[in-house]
Regions:
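Bacterial lipoprotein signal-peptidase II cleavage site
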Residues: 3-15
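Short, well-ordered beta-strand elements
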Residues: 33-46, 96-100, 123-126, 191-192
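Sec-exported extracytoplasmic/periplasmic mature domains
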Residues: 72, 76, 103-106, 128-136
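Surface-exposed binding/hinge segments that line
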Residues: 100, 122, 129-198
Length: 198
């Protein structure tokens, strides 16, 4: 039956009491209607925090994704397009993904002042934080655990540590994170993820 409200079997094709001329007037007036009006959705709730890696609330995530860029984003047609990554691809049918980060992307503070260049190490640091049980107590780790090689093992490893030991961990070259997790940064603007499955 779809959205028409009709059952699809029999029934009237015109609303009761409308003749053909009344319908023609209705069609003419509808051509003058506004068809591309956009009304933004505003949240009436406060954002709990600005750490996009930690948030557990949908309304937080909606707001934060408007002010944070990822490697890729989705265009209005639902296609992946460049954001911080200027190019990306795989050479082994999806087991390994390489992202080339655009040079000149800056981290800015709340006032819009440039603080630092965004580079591949920033993504490694972010992933280490998400996968570190003691640093990220929100437990929002399902996607990286299910997708990235060694992510679940690293998460379980950090669980076995004291809070102090876990907080001392980093994502720097030669770290336990780099040893265990399928992420490489061969240079400042190249990021490689090794996945569990295609």
């Amino acid at each position: 039956s779809g959205c028409s409200g009709a059952s699809g079997e029999g029934g009237e094709t015109e609303p009761p009491g409308e003749s053909g001329s009344a319908q023609e007037e209705s069609v003419e007036s509808s051509s003058n209607e506004i068809t591309d009006l956009v009304i933004p959705k505003l949240s009436t709730k406060e954002i709990a925090g600005f750490n996009i890696l930690y948030t557990q609330k949908g309304e937080d995530f909606e707001g934060l994704t408007s002010i944070w860029d990822g490697l890729l984003e989705v265009d209005p047609e639902g296609k992946l397009v460049p954001a911080i990554a200027e190019e990306w691809g795989t050479e082994d049918e999806g087991l390994t993904w390489t992202f080339k980060i655009r040079e000149g992307v800056k981290w800015v503070n709340v006032n819009g002042e440039e603080m630092a260049d965004c580079n591949a190490q920033d993504f490694a640091t972010g992933l280490e934080w998400v996968l570190n049980f003691h640093k990220n107590d929100s437990l929002n780790t399902s996607m990286p655990l299910e997708m990235i090689e060694g992510a679940e093992e690293y998460y379980e490893y950090t669980k076995s540590l004291s809070k102090e030991e876990a907080y001392a961990l980093t994502a720097e070259e030669g770290s336990k994170f780099r040893e265990m997790v399928g992420l490489e940064t061969p240079d400042d603007y190249t990021l490689i993820y090794r996945c569990l499955d295609k």
